[in-house]
């Protein structure tokens, strides 16, 4: 704590490897965390591979800061830290205070890990660790255990000051959201699409979301589920726009006039065409889906080829080769799984045929699609879309548009 503030130190991730764009990525990381914490007036700086965060020394501010750091893409780890002058006396004094606190909490053994980033400092990393460790050991506060210590005290001598910290929490890694453009996620209520969105967020892409419903055949609870999924994604991406489009009239037309085995695939073709219009309106440069090869009948190689041919935009499928158990594990980690398994059907499952087409030809499906004269219905669906802006939960409320 310095001058009534609490300090945090975070290790940045891949952006430290991006030589030419490094400063751009650092600025984006600073901006993202500042936006997450704008309700508590933070001070954020990224330099030399570290992110420095200072927030007011209140319980509410610290809780908000730690929630934000837990959702911040672009860092590999973070910790609450103590800053002190770059002298051995100050470093030793602060380290001894950390050891004394650990002893009061019932810890018995310790190890020092020191890193001298500023090579001008008067001691090497090993000398810092040895000298500070000797003082703590001789004081009787804790005993040395280099292999299985109860507590590790980290010391970093940086270019302006030194930092000491104990427990280090794992970061999400990846790239800062916003450095890789904008994409439109086709967000259903299932397990896969939120994970696909998170995967693209972790590669630095800002995502907006598109949800298709078929009210009254799909209940309002199904849309509420998707809204809750979008809120979770907004925690990692700062914000998202959720566009909701009704497919009710289109599905009625397909149910009446389309060949039964082609129903799901024709519906997917309609979705892709509408999605392209929404994406261009929102300046998204790609579409994102949660499709995984051969996971269900509509995701055979041939079916994916047909839907890809319906848009001029690239379709990113980050889960295309993923195992279902791995997808579920990620969904659980990011907080979407419990929402996704709520028992409400989406529009794709309502009228799914018993024996869907598995090996369609692109030309044949395009002929079927064109014969249905769906253009006016697609235009109506796009025209009656509804949008909601959703923000991450860092003291900012969501607002409708």
Curated annotation (Swiss-Prot):
Q: What is its EC number?
A: 2.8.1.4
Indicate the principal place this protein occupies in or around the cell.
cytoplasm
The keyword tRNA-binding appears for this protein? yes
Annotated residues for binding of ATP: 186-187, 211-212, 268, 290, 299
Query: GO cellular-component terms in the record?
Result: cytosol
Q: Does the keyword RNA-binding apply?
A: yes
Alphabetized CDD domains for the sequence:
PPase_ThiI, THUMP_ThiI
**What would be one Pfam family of this protein?**
THUMP
Which UniProt keywords are listed? ATP-binding, Cytoplasm, Nucleotide-binding, RNA-binding, Thiamine biosynthesis, Transferase, tRNA-binding
GO terms assigned for molecular function: ATP binding; CCA tRNA nucleotidyltransferase activity; tRNA binding; tRNA-uracil-4 sulfurtransferase activity
Instruction: Tell me the InterPro entries matching this sequence.
Output: Rossmann-like_a/b/a_fold (IPR014729), ThiI_AANH (IPR020536), ThiI_fer (IPR054173), ThiI_N (IPR049961), THUMP_dom (IPR004114), THUMP_ThiI (IPR049962), tRNA_STrfase (IPR003720), tRNA_sulfurtransferase_ThiI (IPR050102)
What domain of life does the UniProt record list for this protein's source? Bacteria
User: What reaction gets catalysed by this protein?
Assistant: [ThiI sulfur-carrier protein]-S-sulfanyl-L-cysteine + a uridine in tRNA + 2 reduced [2Fe-2S]-[ferredoxin] + ATP + H(+) = [ThiI sulfur-carrier protein]-L-cysteine + a 4-thiouridine in tRNA + 2 oxidized [2Fe-2S]-[ferredoxin] + AMP + diphosphate; [ThiS sulfur-carrier protein]-C-terminal Gly-Gly-AMP + S-sulfanyl-L-cysteinyl-[cysteine desulfurase] + AH2 = [ThiS sulfur-carrier protein]-C-terminal-Gly-aminoethanethioate + L-cysteinyl-[cysteine desulfurase] + A + AMP + 2 H(+)
Spell out the subcellular localization from the entry: Cytoplasm
Biological process terms in GO annotation: thiamine biosynthetic process; thiamine diphosphate biosynthetic process; thiazole biosynthetic process; tRNA 4-thiouridine biosynthesis
Q: In which pathway does it act?
A: Cofactor biosynthesis; thiamine diphosphate biosynthesis
Which segments constitute the THUMP domain?
63-168
Query: Which family does the entry's similarity section mention?
Result: Belongs to the ThiI family.
Query: Any idea what job this protein has?
Result: Catalyzes the ATP-dependent transfer of a sulfur to tRNA to produce 4-thiouridine in position 8 of tRNAs, which functions as a near-UV photosensor. Also catalyzes the transfer of sulfur to the sulfur carrier protein ThiS, forming ThiS-thiocarboxylate. This is a step in the synthesis of thiazole, in the thiamine biosynthesis pathway. The sulfur is donated as persulfide by IscS.
Q: This protein is called what?
A: Probable tRNA sulfurtransferase
This chain's source organism reads Treponema pallidum subsp. pallidum (strain SS14)
């Amino acid at each position: 704590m310095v001058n009534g503030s609490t300090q945090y130190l975070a290790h940045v991730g891949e952006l430290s490897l991006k030589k030419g764009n490094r400063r751009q990525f650092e600025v984006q990381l600073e901006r993202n965390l500042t936006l997450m914490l704008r309700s508590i007036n933070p001070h954020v700086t990224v330099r030399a591979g570290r992110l420095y965060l200072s927030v007011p020394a209140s319980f509410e501010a610290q809780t908000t800061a730690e929630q934000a750091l837990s959702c911040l893409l672009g860092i590999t780890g973070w910790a609450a830290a103590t800053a002190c002058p770059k002298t051995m006396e100050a470093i030793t004094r602060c380290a001894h205070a950390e050891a004394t606190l650990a002893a009061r909490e019932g810890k018995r053994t310790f190890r020092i890990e020191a890193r001298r980033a500023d090579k001008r400092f008067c001691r090497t990393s090993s000398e810092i660790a040895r000298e500070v460790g000797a003082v703590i050991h001789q004081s009787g506060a804790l005993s040395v255990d280099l292999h299985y210590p109860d507590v590790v005290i980290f010391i970093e001598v940086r270019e302006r000051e030194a930092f000491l910290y104990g427990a280090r929490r794992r970061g999400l890694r990846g790239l800062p959201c916003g450095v890789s453009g904008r994409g439109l996620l086709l967000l259903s209520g299932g397990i896969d699409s939120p994970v696909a969105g998170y995967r693209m967020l972790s590669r630095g892409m800002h995502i907006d979301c598109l949800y298709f419903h078929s009210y009254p055949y799909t209940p309002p609870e199904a849309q509420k589920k998707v809204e809750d999924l979008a809120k979770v994604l907004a925690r990692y991406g700062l914000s998202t726009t959720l566009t909701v489009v009704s497919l009710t009239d289109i599905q009625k037309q397909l149910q009446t006039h389309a060949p039964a085995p082609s129903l799901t695939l024709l519906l997917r073709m309609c979705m892709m065409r509408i999605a392209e219009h929404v994406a261009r309106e929102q300046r998204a440069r790609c579409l994102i889906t949660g499709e995984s090869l051969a996971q269900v009948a509509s995701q055979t190689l041939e079916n994916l080829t047909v839907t890809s041919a319906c848009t001029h935009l690239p379709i990113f499928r980050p889960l295309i080769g993923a195992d279902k158990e791995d997808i579920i594990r990620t969904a659980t980690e990011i907080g979407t799984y419990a929402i996704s398994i709520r028992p409400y059907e989406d529009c794709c499952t309502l009228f799914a045929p018993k024996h869907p087409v598995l090996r369609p030809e692109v030309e044949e499906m395009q002929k079927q699609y064109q014969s249905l004269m769906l253009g006016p219905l697609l235009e109506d669906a796009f025209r009656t879309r509804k949008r909601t802006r959703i923000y991450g939960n860092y003291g900012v409320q969501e607002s409708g548009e």
